């Protein structure tokens, strides 16, 4: 895939408008100006905006920087996360994005990747800024490019955030932790209704 000696910025998921992949492409075009040899963008998935994204890649002259895999099975997702260093989630400032939190950020963090989310509430509240990830101003490709550049050029920050993110997910959002919380809630309800 041509990733040797490159940092991999990667997105795994559905290619729909509200995910903001057009914003990610714009940010990568800006990043290319000063760091073109330093990164590749891996886009894993498929969806309604796939052809639009391919046209945008050509328009922004990102053909040498972007790799599309198409849809992959859920069993292959972890293999692709193993290739990724930085996991941006550029969701747009739409109501559905403000309210609904996907599992993607937890998967990326559990894999020890640097999570960079847009400032939509459902994502921003997951991140402890600078510790477990970074947040950029929603719908702002310039700010996303700045955050990408920050972690692209700072190896220590990248390692620290990835390690902290992994630890935080294991301590707060593993299936064992979640099942204990749910069990505790049920136990409390049962106790109150005796």
PLM regions: where:
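A short, well-ordered alpha-helix in the C-terminal region of glycosyltransferases
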Residues: 143, 150, 157-171, 181-184, ...
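Short hydrophobic beta-strand element within catalytic cores of glycosyltransferases
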Residues: 86-89, 107-117, 127
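Nucleotide-activated donor-binding/catalytic signature segment of Leloir-type glycosyltransferases, i.e.
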Residues: 44, 51-78
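Conserved donor-binding/catalytic core segment of Leloir-type glycosyltransferases
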Residues: 2-28, 42, 182
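Conserved acidic donor-binding segment of nucleotide-sugar-dependent glycosyltransferases
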Residues: 129-130, 134-141, 150-156
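Short donor-sugar binding/catalytic loops of nucleotide-sugar-dependent glycosyltransferases
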Residues: 12-16, 31, 47, 72
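Short Ser/Thr-rich beta->loop micro-motif in glycosyltransferases that lines
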Residues: 89-98
């Amino acid at each position: 895939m041509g990733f040797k000696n490159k940092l991999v910025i990667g997105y795994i998921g559905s290619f729909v408008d509200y995910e903001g992949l057009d914003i990610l492409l714009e940010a990568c075009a800006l990043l290319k100006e000063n760091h073109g040899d330093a990164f590749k963008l891996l886009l894993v998935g498929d969806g309604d905006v796939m052809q639009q994204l391919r046209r945008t890649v050509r328009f922004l002259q990102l053909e040498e920087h972007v790799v599309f895999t198409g849809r992959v099975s859920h069993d292959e997702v972890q293999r692709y996360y193993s290739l990724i260093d930085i996991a941006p989630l550029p969701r747009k400032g739409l109501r559905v994005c403000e309210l609904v939190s996907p599992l993607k950020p937890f998967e990326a963090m559990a894999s020890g990747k640097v999570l960079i989310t847009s400032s939509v509430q459902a994502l921003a509240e997951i991140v402890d800024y600078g510790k477990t990830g970074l947040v950029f101003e929603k719908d702002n490709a310039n700010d996303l490019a700045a955050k990408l550049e920050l972690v692209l050029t700072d190896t220590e920050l990248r390692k620290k955030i990835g390690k902290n993110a992994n630890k935080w997910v294991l301590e707060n959002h593993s299936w064992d932790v979640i099942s204990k919380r749910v069990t505790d809630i049920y136990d409390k309800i049962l106790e109150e209704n005796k």
